[in-house]
């Protein structure tokens, strides 16, 4: 028997604008007891059918919408249609930018709530972040196999957000072969080695591709400090752009070893690159205190705010780290700074950087704005899909 959800009167406005989330406080009643991730019918308070979605009894987001079409079933064919639709955009990007690695499915922004799929050559790496995604895993895998008959599918659902959905963390092969230690992808003429099994997220930060390419114009004949370098993405583009010297700083020796390997496979001059195992906050203070200066500092830290109650602390962290970066820049130098915290909007991030400039006693000009790459699209009904923002700043 299909379970039906009825919304509180007046709580259907966002849904009518095709926002895909229904919060627990918006539900008036339910006919039946849905299981974890079960597909349910969603009605207005007066009984008008509105959508079909996945139920999550433990999450504040109690249901995520699969479809607003009453005649559309949630089956393998549904996922095939969504995959083909998403591939259309990625084909354009792959041809234009020479990509062999990209985000194929960006969750709600591609009409598949809680599902992220990154493609590295013929390896499809899935993160299933919601109860509905988990419940429909088999159909999703079948759809991937139909669309990409020679694919290898690997799961990287080792993320803490699954706990909020009542799910355990999972990793492993879903179809085909185990990924090798290194899968080489290419973007904008740069080769990048990706560790699918042990790397951050699904192996690489694909969302910064456009920012990496645009950073090249700031680095020619410059000294560059690449903070939170991971496997060297920005550092590789700095060498591509003609940097005089690049220091890649990260706390993970494994990531730094991969960064060095990436430098070698691109044929860049290793004498121009340095790989420093260090805590970035401590390193910046050391550079400030001993008078070390750079022409360009790239600041791409991990997410500082996972929830609203962490936002105040995150603001302090972003301000401190940007202040330190400004203090070690030569006059007229460039700060490329980013935030991937979705809870921090662009205006707030800009204010934080401005406040950091005051504390650093430096004048800052915002000269360029950055955001996530086009394979991480923003659906018009889902503004929460925008999370990555950044600035190029001239520091005087």
Swiss-Prot record:
<dbReference type="InterPro" id="IPR029063">
    <property type="entry name" value="SAM-dependent_MTases_sf"/>
</dbReference>
<keyword id="KW-0963">Cytoplasm</keyword>
<dbReference type="InterPro" id="IPR002478">
    <property type="entry name" value="PUA"/>
</dbReference>
<keyword id="KW-0808">Transferase</keyword>
<dbReference type="InterPro" id="IPR041532">
    <property type="entry name" value="RlmI-like_PUA"/>
</dbReference>
<dbReference type="GO" id="GO:0003723">
    <property type="term" value="F:RNA binding"/>
</dbReference>
<keyword id="KW-0489">Methyltransferase</keyword>
<dbReference type="InterPro" id="IPR036974">
    <property type="entry name" value="PUA_sf"/>
</dbReference>
<dbReference type="InterPro" id="IPR023542">
    <property type="entry name" value="RLMI"/>
</dbReference>
<keyword id="KW-0694">RNA-binding</keyword>
<keyword id="KW-0698">rRNA processing</keyword>
<dbReference type="GO" id="GO:0016434">
    <property type="term" value="F:rRNA (cytosine) methyltransferase activity"/>
</dbReference>
<dbReference type="InterPro" id="IPR019614">
    <property type="entry name" value="SAM-dep_methyl-trfase"/>
</dbReference>
<protein>
    <recommendedName>
        <fullName>Ribosomal RNA large subunit methyltransferase I</fullName>
        <ecNumber>2.1.1.191</ecNumber>
    </recommendedName>
</protein>
<feature type="domain" description="PUA">
    <location>
        <begin position="2"/>
        <end position="81"/>
    </location>
</feature>
<comment type="function">
    <text>Specifically methylates the cytosine at position 1962 (m5C1962) of 23S rRNA.</text>
</comment>
<dbReference type="GO" id="GO:0005737">
    <property type="term" value="C:cytoplasm"/>
</dbReference>
<keyword id="KW-0949">S-adenosyl-L-methionine</keyword>
<dbReference type="Pfam" id="PF10672">
    <property type="entry name" value="Methyltrans_SAM"/>
</dbReference>
<dbReference type="Pfam" id="PF17785">
    <property type="entry name" value="PUA_3"/>
</dbReference>
<dbReference type="InterPro" id="IPR015947">
    <property type="entry name" value="PUA-like_sf"/>
</dbReference>
<comment type="similarity">
    <text>Belongs to the methyltransferase superfamily. RlmI family.</text>
</comment>
